[in-house]
């Protein structure tokens, strides 16, 4: 949802609006600060202003682009959120420790299924695909032993 009244951020918004008016938009912006100051809201509002079809100093909130931004459904908006980290896992620990027992069991089962697969995976330089029906026609030097 676009919030046009982010409290305490008038100077920041005026700077971003002047950047938009002057067509001097950079390729990336970093919104940084303590929790609760409106970084996410300011970033979404600025993105909405840049994509607005009738921009002034604020997004018009009436065009189709602004309507999509209101519901966070615009194709140019990508919200990236980090996954929470498990505190018990250290960088020096083996990679399998990071997997839950259920995930590890599923991985073992998939590896068993792959082991029973009768087809041999061929890796040839500069070869993108080899139809399965033609694998018996390859030269013996190219077959994996």
Would you name each region that the model predicts?
Residues 2-137:
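Clamp-loader machinery-focused feature within the broader ASCE/P-loop NTPase space
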Residues 136, 141-145:
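Single conserved hydrophobic/aromatic residue that forms the stacking wall/gate
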């Amino acid at each position: 949802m676009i919030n046009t009244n982010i409290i305490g951020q008038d100077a920041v918004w005026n700077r971003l609006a002047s950047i938009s008016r002057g067509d001097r938009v950079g390729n990336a912006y970093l919104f940084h600060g303590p929790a609760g100051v409106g970084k996410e809201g300011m970033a979404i509002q600025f993105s909405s202003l840049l994509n607005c079809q009738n921009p002034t100093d604020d997004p018009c909130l009436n065009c189709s682009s602004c309507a999509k931004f209101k519901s966070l459904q615009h194709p140019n908006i990508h919200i990236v959120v980090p996954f929470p980290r498990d505190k018990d896992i250290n960088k020096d620990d083996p990679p399998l420790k990071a997997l839950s027992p259920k995930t590890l069991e599923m991985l073992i089962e998939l590896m068993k299924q792959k082991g029973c697969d009768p087809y041999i995976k061929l890796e040839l330089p500069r070869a993108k695909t080899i139809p399965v029906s033609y694998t018996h026609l390859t030269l013996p030097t190219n077959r994996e032993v």
